[in-house]
Amino acid sequence: MKWQLLTQKRHVLGKIFTIAVLTGCTGMLCVSCNRSQDVLVTEIGVSRPNRLTPKTSKAGEFYIQGQNQHAKGNSKLAIAAYSKSISLNSQYAPAFKSRGLAYFDVGNKEGAIADYNQALRLNPNDAETYNNRGNARASLGDQQNAITDYNEAIRLANNYAEAYNNRGNARATQGDKDGALADYTQAIRIDQTYSVAYNNRGNTYAYQGYQQKAIADYNQAIRLNPNFAPALNNRGNAFAATGDKRSALQDLQRAAAILDKEGNKELYQQVMKNIEELGR
């Protein structure tokens, strides 16, 4: 996609990467935003597996099996274990919540939402589940209901940096750039080491044409996480927008090398397209 931000011989690249955090950082999943060709990179995490105790119920045992499988990246096996847990105890909110994460992991967003609904019916004060349901709704293009969920997550936990970040993403998708900036800034106030929020605020500054502010935010994101390939790609995009093709190429090549090493073929190919566009 071409951002209409430049004049004369300056260059701008085709893709920026926006990060939405669910609950942790154990994996990455790509989904496309409805209103643009940007790429939403979602970091998917599961809770650390609990240790079995002599008092653990059968439902609890299957729940812990599910956590162990999910932590290993075996989402389908995790779903099977969570389902067994639920069949033994239909009031077990953590199993619905965790199965929702696993469904999201395999691309079943509707199934994820259904499970989050059940988890919230059983535990209506769980801020994390509201955040997770918001992410599932946002991935389906339902930004307004996603924002409603993020609002509730923030009401229940007013220092929930990830919920502010995710609400910022939804607002940015709706075109509310000022609202997005406010949310990203609040996320950073809560957690000054939050590289994801720096990256996303940088994207919003870049979209508005404030390339130097964008570069400053990308610098912070990369300082906090030197192997943060999306931020390297995005800083390269901003450098290209200022006419600094040399710095842009360096960042894009670093991003491509990291993504190639990680085996993230889709994002690697997009960065390579950015490099190709830069040479035009």
PLM feature spans:
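N-terminal secretory signal peptides that target proteins for export/translocation
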Residues: 1-12
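Terminal, low-structured helical/coil segments at or just beyond the last alpha-helical repeat
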Residues: 38-51, 246-280
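Conserved alpha-helical positions within TPR/SEL1-like repeat arrays
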Residues: 60-71, 83, 94-105, 116-117, ...
